[in-house]
Amino acid sequence: MNSYITVYDQVLSDDQCDYFIDKFEKDTSAHEVQNNSHFSEEGERNATLTQINMLHSPNTIWREDVNFLTQTIGKCVEVYKDQNYITPYQWPDKYSLEPPKMKRYLANTSDEFPPHVDVLDYETARRFLVIFMYLNDNIGGHTYFPSMDIEIECK
């Protein structure tokens, strides 16, 4: 069975990635620390990450960046649909994107995002596709899908 997990390299240039990382680090007033503590086979794990909701306020400094990312994501979605043989019957006629978020995971810390479910009730049952854009190639950084035993290295 197709997992529908698809990797595209060089969606953003190195300069664009550096730009987003630098802007994230400077926009400390928009940083939110997310508590991701959870139980695992080893017991309770304290976990966090730092994120920015790029449309956190009407006067956000990220508005033009969001427009650029929305266009970039739209192009990726069209390629994704083609490469995964998605037919019109498998894709909604109308959909929208959630406000993009940037998440930072620091190496050698408790930063992580454990396996989870995004849909908890009727109100949140809108998400059907997730897109990750890795902005650096941190050694050891990856996304792991435990139920499929698939690991995607950041690059």
Question: What are these model-predicted stretches?
Answer:
Residues 1-155:
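Fe(II)/2-oxoglutarate oxygenase catalytic core
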